[in-house]
């Protein structure tokens, strides 16, 4: 591994060789299992029932009691099971794909005319960090609302910064 010395930091070689490879085509899965703990904080609470038809982007679990994130369907299809995962007491929603990947017809672009509306849109989206803690993004941005910081610009850097990782 090559290291370059800098006065204030260590720079690892990026080694993102797979970035030059042909993209992998991923087909729609036949089933998804969405746990209610895909974020830090309280568990999300299912709002769908077995037998319900769901669409891509449809809200299927609301935020838990505190510091939580909602969960949305990632495929269209039928809810086949809501049960604890084998690893513990965390509920998961099982969805069998209908193969159509139909978007939720009720989805609309959020209206964001100020910081509060922006923060609410981020909260409702269920967006969380990709780090190990899956920290809810709205909680990070909440400092705008409570006055801890004055923020006039939010810059989203969606580029992967970790050496060797090209899949995020």
State each model region's role:
Residues 165-168:
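Glycine-rich phosphate-binding "P-loop"
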